[in-house]
Amino acid sequence: MSQPPTKRPDAETRRAQLLDAADAVFTAHGVNAPLELIVAHAGVGRATLYRQFEDRNAILLALMERSVQRLHAKAQSLNAAPDAFFLLLEYLAERIVRSPALSDYWRSTSLHDPRFAPARQMVAETFMPALERAQAHGLVRSDVQPRDIPLLSGMLGAALRGSSDAERLRLARQALSIIRRGLAPDAV
């Protein structure tokens, strides 16, 4: 994934502030919300936003990269848990429910868009050890591959159809249950 150039600590802090603000604004108003709302929410000037990000797409890409980095950190925190694969899917479902606009944007991107290839690759690499452990422990069918992760993510994304946080959470849990049963070795 693209790494921003090394910045001064205060610039890094402002970048994180802007990303937090963008996540909150996009969650509340969608990814097409005016960028001025992000500036106001972050409590910075418009010039600060544009020093950090050239446009809306740069903000969205940075949010996606941050989301993937957090997924990777979550995977590492699970160490060698046999059910880490399903715990990662649960974490992904929670993120989808908490950031529906970003999740919807992520799902709408082309699988062939080179800007998102590093993020997609990191997701696959993040899930691979957990998938292999789950398969070794008989929790997941042997024919499930990392290339299936975007499909599973899309199934979890169906939770976005809920009209409230509670309904989205219920739908995400239902999707997780269906996925778990469908991936079980005895489901074939």
Sequence positions of predicted segments:
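Alpha-helical DNA-contacting segments of helix-turn-helix folds
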Residues: 53, 57-67
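Helix-turn-helix/winged-helix DNA-binding modules
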Residues: 30-31, 51, 141
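Amphipathic C-terminal alpha-helical segment
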Residues: 98-103, 133, 150-169, 180-188
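Hydrophobic alpha-helical connector segments
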Residues: 62, 72-98, 112-115
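Amphipathic alpha-helical packing segments from all-alpha helical-bundle domains
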Residues: 112-154, 161-162, 170, 174
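Short linear capping/connector segments at secondary-structure termini
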Residues: 104-113
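Short hydrophobic/aromatic patch on the recognition helix
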Residues: 43-53
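Basic, helix-initiating cap at the start of DNA-binding domains
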Residues: 1-32, 36-41, 58
